[in-house]
């Protein structure tokens, strides 16, 4: 072995060429390849706490009141390295919590504050999150003290809650239960722009048509949480900004009243920072030098802290007393005329005309100095937009009502991605059930499961009907925001009962049979639907020569239409389901990519996705009875035929359309089967083919059945947080 060349050029002979930082990855070489990495995230290999760590058990040891006291003390314990504005960190902590929770979007349930992802790229380095690294460093001594008993995710949101309480707001409540991740998510699409704060209309823009924001995005620019505070594309126009606000907040499931409350309540305290030159700031945390130790936006050319801090570039406080909860925001916004100006950093902002001296906030360091308050374009939208103005006027006239609406909206903002109340923990969990929590009443557990199974088996329903209905009921689950799933049996309610992908005619027939059995047995329809799917699988396994009992956990309840926000559930409608070989229409995204997205939301691994596809095909569960991918002559038997025939080199594959193929016998030229892209990707993609070959092996027929049952049970129980 010769190392002289590497050594003589100053390169390390051991690591030279190793994949440690910059290098061409497989995705760089083959950008159209499926990114299966999204199915393999956040496992024990990256978690320093180990596979046996149980956060809920750790929470039971937490002294909640002591933690809250420490957080309140932190608010006024100003540090020299990053001084608190007016001696109070409340505004900074609220912004940190807001921007942690505020990445949530209802379309796919991704984002939000439930994982502590603000600690990692890209969020830790978004322009809109500038200097929030300082907030997390201020929290570190408290995190260090309480250790595993409090996650970063919970701590960041709780810090925002305590900030509001320390300034006089009566909050609605708080729930612990957010578990930390240990590396950035690989499944969240933040946009395709190649630069921060890219304007609409440019390359890879998230906008099309008449300012139509790409789904599932809920922010107007790459690197922002919601809207541009200076105006659309940085051009002040409150009416246009109002439209951006309406879209982005709606994509977080917030209505106009909640939007006004959150905007005003967020700006009642704290300030924006732009008293200096943005050009003096160093790189963001991910781009900073090693010795910066994960801190970004450092100013090494001027003071850069206190009154000289630069963050957004906008400068000033919104209210006269920015460290207390009051109604001054609406007083100033609605009582004064406002004119457009620029901050010292060159950012557009609005300042009042002829404001009284006593209405001006004091300097963050010297109370003898007063400055004009300011408003962003988003704030001015609350005054100029007619609907927002009506709400603002009501809040101004009724401060108590404003405080109540804000407290509830803040709770919704910071808890929306946590899922049902079964996941909530702690002494401050509100007793009230809120419709956005998708409440489900508890179901019975004390009944004879085998007796119900016998009734289902004798009902005349086919294996396909039973399995398809159970799958359709459970497949709505999203591991992102913990919504959907079989619990509640909302498949029988609007809007789900009418979704095209649920085949309403077939669904209605099956539900009529199962509802009768549920009523006779005194159990929930939700349990009966899942149990029917299990019965179908057991029958299919027996037909394949394998005796198996599918695990079942009773206790699901039946939700009512009054407990269901129909509009909110519309976003759960499947546009495609590769497991049932169905697409509502053709999309830019390929069918196999949509399958991958669905599998990730169901929290499936690639092997689990693979075995489910193979099983669902031979069970005859395709949408509309389609024969695509049904590579078997024994439909209804849980065999590994799908994989055996997919990997058989006796066949060749020919495209017949955009998403259709024929599988042809090489010798005779006879068409044996038809398929879709979703079917053939398990023979085309090298990783998926490796899994398919495992299940095609002669010695793995029983393993296939057992693995299918395990993956099926995982999906059926995905929303059973009461079992944890």
Swiss-Prot record:
Cross-link (Tryptophyl-tyrosyl-methioninium (Trp-Tyr) (with M-252)) at residue(s): 98-226
Catalytic residues (positions): 99
Cross-link (Tryptophyl-tyrosyl-methioninium (Tyr-Met) (with W-98)): 226-252
GO BP annotations, alphabetical order: cellular response to hydrogen peroxide; hydrogen peroxide catabolic process
GO molecular function, one term: catalase activity
Function: Bifunctional enzyme with both catalase and broad-spectrum peroxidase activity.
Subunit text: Homodimer or homotetramer.
Protein name: Catalase-peroxidase
Source organism per UniProt: Vibrio cholerae serotype O1 (strain ATCC 39315 / El Tor Inaba N16961)
């Amino acid at each position: 072995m010769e190392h002289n060349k590497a050594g003589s050029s100053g390169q390390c002979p051991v690591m030279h060429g190793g994949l440690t930082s910059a290098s061409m990855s497989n995705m760089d070489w083959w950008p159209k390849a499926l990114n299966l990495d999204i199915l393999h995230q956040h496992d024990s290999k990256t978690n320093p706490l180990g596979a046996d760590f149980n956060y809920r058990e750790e929470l039971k040891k937490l002294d909640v009141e002591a933690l809250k006291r420490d957080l309140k003390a932190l608010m006024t314990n100003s540090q020299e390295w990053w001084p608190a504005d007016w001696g109070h960190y409340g505004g900074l902590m609220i912004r940190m919590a807001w921007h942690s929770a505020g990445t949530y979007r209802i379309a796919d349930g991704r984002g939000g504050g439930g994982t502590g992802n603000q600690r990692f790229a890209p969020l830790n380095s978004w322009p809109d999150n500038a200097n929030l690294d300082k907030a997390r460093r201020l929290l570190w001594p408290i995190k260090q003290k309480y250790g595993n008993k409090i996650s970063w995710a919970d701590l960041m949101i709780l810090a925002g809650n305590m900030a509001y309480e320390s300034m006089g707001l009566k909050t609605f409540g708080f729930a612990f239960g957010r578990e930390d991740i240990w590396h950035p998510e690989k499944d969240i699409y933040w946009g395709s722009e190649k630069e921060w704060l890219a304007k609409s209309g440019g390359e890879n823009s998230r906008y099309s048509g008449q300012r139509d924001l790409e789904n599932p995005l809920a922010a107007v620019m790459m690197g922002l949480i919601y809207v541009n505070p200076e105006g659309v594309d940085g051009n002040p126009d409150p009416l246009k900004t109002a439209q951006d606000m309406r879209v982005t907040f709606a994509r977080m499931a917030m209505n106009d009243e909640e939007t006004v409350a959150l905007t005003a309540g967020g700006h009642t305290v704290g300030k924006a920072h732009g008293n200096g030159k943005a050009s003096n700031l160093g790189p963001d945390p991910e781009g900073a030098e090693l010795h910066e130790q994960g801190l970004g936006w450092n100013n090494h050319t001027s003071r850069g802290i206190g009154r000289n801090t630069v963050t957004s570039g906008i400068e000033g406080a919104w209210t006269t007393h920015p460290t207390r909860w009051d109604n001054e925001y609406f007083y100033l916004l609605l009582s004064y005329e406002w004119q457009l100006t620029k901050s010292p950093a060159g950012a557009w902002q609005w300042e009042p005309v002829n404001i009284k001296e006593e209405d001006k906030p004091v300097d963050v360091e010297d109370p003898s100095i007063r400055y004009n308050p300011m408003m962003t374009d988003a704030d001015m939208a609350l005054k100029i937009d007619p609907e927002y103005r009506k709400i603002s006027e009501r809040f101004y006239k009724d401060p108590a009502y404003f405080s109540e609406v804000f407290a509830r909206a803040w709770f919704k903002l910071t808890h929306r991605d946590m899922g049902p109340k079964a996941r909530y923990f702690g002494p401050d969990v509100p007793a009230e059930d809120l419709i956005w929590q998708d409440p489900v009443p508890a179901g019975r557990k004390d009944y004879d499961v085998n007796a119900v199974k016998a009734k289902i088996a004798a009902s005349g329903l086919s294996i396909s009907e039973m399995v398809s209905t159970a799958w359709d009921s459970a497949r709505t689950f999203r591991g992102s925001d913990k919504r959907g799933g079989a619990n509640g049996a909302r498949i029988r309610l609007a809007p789900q009962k009418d979704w095209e992908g649920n085949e309403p005619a077939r669904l209605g027939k099956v539900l009529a049979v199962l509802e009768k059995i549920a009523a006779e047995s005194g159990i929930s329809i939700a349990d009966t639907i899942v149990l029917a799917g299990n019965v179908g699988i057991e029958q299919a396994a027996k037909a394949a020569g394998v005796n198996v009992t599918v695990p079942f956990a009773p206790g699901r309840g039946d939700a009512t239409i009054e407990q269901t926000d129909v509009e909110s559930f519309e976003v759960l409608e499947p546009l495609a389901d590769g497991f049932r070989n169905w697409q509502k229409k053709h999309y830019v995204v390929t069918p196999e990519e949509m399958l991958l997205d669905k599998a990730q939301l169901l929290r499936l691994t690639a092997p689990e996705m693979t075995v489910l596809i193979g099983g669902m095909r031979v069970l005859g569960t395709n949408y509309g009875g389609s024969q695509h991918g049904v590579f078997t002559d024994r439909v209804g038997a849980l065999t590994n035929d799908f994989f055996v025939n997919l990997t058989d080199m006796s066949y060749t594959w020919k495209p017949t359309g955009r998403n259709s193929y024929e599988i042809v016998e090489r010798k005779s030229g006879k068409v044996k089967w038809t398929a879709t892209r979703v079917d053939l990707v398990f023979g085309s993609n090298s990783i998926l083919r490796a899994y398919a070959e495992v299940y095609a092996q002669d010695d793995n027929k029983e393993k296939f059945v057992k693995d299918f049952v395990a993956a099926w049970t995982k999906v059926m129980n995905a929303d059973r947080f009461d079992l944890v």
